[in-house]
Amino acid sequence: MTSEPIIPMNYIDTHTHIYSEEFDDDRTEVVERALKAGAQHLLLPNIDEASIQPMLALCEAYPDLCRPMMGLHPTELPADPWPLLNKMEGLLTAPNAPYIAVGEVGIDLYWDDSRRDEQICVFKHQAEWALRFGLPLMVHSRAAHRELVDTLLPFKDDITGIFHCFGGSDEEAHELLQTFPGFVLGIGGVVTFKKSKLPAVLRAIVPLERIVVETDAPYLTPTPYRGTRNEPSYVPLVIAKLAEVYERPIEEVEEILLQNTHRIFQYI
């Protein structure tokens, strides 16, 4: 693996899971590297019941840096998801609730589509939270583009959010951006992969003003660190690639990405 120095930039990692056990041995150092690389905020989507406490603990340890979300990931549905969903709704409605979005929520049929209808129902229920509580959605979608669009269609003019880790086709990008004007695409390490088709899709279809950056750490590490654990300090590598894709100065890309992020999360 060929490494390269991280050039500090001003950025917000809109999707990172550094509260997970993969970071238990060096979480403090990971945060320090993120700050050194220029991170202004690290936004933390929840996954399931077990992730709530470590996520909130990290936000308490770094209240100016880390901001939590609340939601149930589609691949983590319990046999009966409704007691947990009721608990999560209670957390969202508690006095002084710290949550900046409903997430990570969505539909994932890549490995298993046996609970397709239940995933759709749970996703719709959580989209209704976003509408009721005035929060953006952090959306996970894998092998479920049509189901995603159909489920969100009734909300298209009323909620905002991020289609996290977008890696779809020209047609899918166009449909998402045209159908959901309040949403942006979350772009991470995949855009740096040698054989990725994402740069061409972005260049052809997606205005820079409809993008935010993310890591999805510990996953989807950008080149040249691909194959190792991802972390928020690698976001500048993604920004540099986007500057190349859009043929714009890095400083301009930094500023536009920050503006896009603040447009979705207006209270950061």
Predicted regions and their residues:
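Mid-domain alpha/beta scaffold segments of enzyme catalytic cores
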Residues: T2-I268
